[in-house]
Amino acid sequence: MTVIDNHGVLAKDGELSEASARDYFELLKPRVMSLVVFTAFAGLVLAPGHIHPVLGTIAILCIAVGAGASGALNMWYDADIDAIMSRTANRPIPAGRIAPSEALAFGLVLSGFSVVILGLAVNWLSAGILAFTIFFYAVVYTMWLKRSTPQNIVIGGAAGAFPPMIGWACVTNSVTIESTVLFLIIFLWTPAHFWALALFKMRDYEAVGVPMLPNVAGERVTKHQIVAYAVLTAVCAVLPSFLGFASLGYGLVAAALGAIFIYCSIAVWRMPDGDLKMIPAKKLFGFSIFYLFAVFSALMIDRLAPVLVSHAGGWF
């Protein structure tokens, strides 16, 4: 296998690259990994019960490594299209800094390591969900869904939604309705988030033949779908209050954040077809990231606030 960009042959299998530690770190998709770590940590915090801090730290590290491993496998498989798309052309493999075979080996080793250590140190249910998540993202999404259906993000979004469920399972050794709701918040959030990106990166996706919804169904259909998923996400995000594992205060915060999320999605819906600047889509993409962090932060604050207040009361 050979990686080629506009300047010719950049890296070949069988040749040792001169990659730096930073290049290998970039293979892990650190921005995506940070969101995975954050939501997994939220699952740990929100779960009833207790986990030893050392085991909790090991769990988070294993989840982070597993997420990074799936990112490396994704970059290995997608090197051909990454070399063409402007936002991915400088990734380590298409840029020639890491050979594809090295990236594959790196991803496989980290995958096995993260799953085995999580199983041995914490429990095998959480390790099993982590293994399934890696497989789903690297194989089901990357190798099949991404290039075959405009619903790639809808179905494939499950991979990014599992981390809080894994964190929850690390503490409880179970999958519950509460952890399923945490899963659903991210699962329903994903289409609006990524289709906003797909709108202002339509040409990139068209150039590499990835059937993102805007390229297949058009801007108008995509905008309707974005609004629909924003509404579903906002509704799902207030469910913890109704199900009793978050307070009314959290519910009000989630409702306010959801209203802004829906407002931003409606701004995208109102955007004229063919708009070259795509400013509403870019704003929605940016806010959607803040929204998810804010919702899970609010959940954790809601969970920890009574504990912190009770401890503070003991100091006076």
UniProtKB/Swiss-Prot annotation:
GO terms for biological process: heme O biosynthetic process. Pathway: Porphyrin-containing compound metabolism; heme O biosynthesis; heme O from protoheme: step 1/1. Keywords: Cell inner membrane, Cell membrane, Heme biosynthesis, Membrane, Transferase, Transmembrane, Transmembrane helix. It is found in: Cell inner membrane. It is a multi-pass membrane protein. GO terms for cellular component: plasma membrane. Its EC number is 2.5.1.141. It holds the Pfam family UbiA. It comes from the Bacteria. It catalyses: heme b + (2E,6E)-farnesyl diphosphate + H2O = Fe(II)-heme o + diphosphate. GO terms for molecular function: protoheme IX farnesyltransferase activity. Belongs to the UbiA prenyltransferase family. Protoheme IX farnesyltransferase subfamily. Carbon 2 of the heme B porphyrin ring is defined according to the Fischer nomenclature. This is Protoheme IX farnesyltransferase. It comes from Rhizobium johnstonii (strain DSM 114642 / LMG 32736 / 3841).
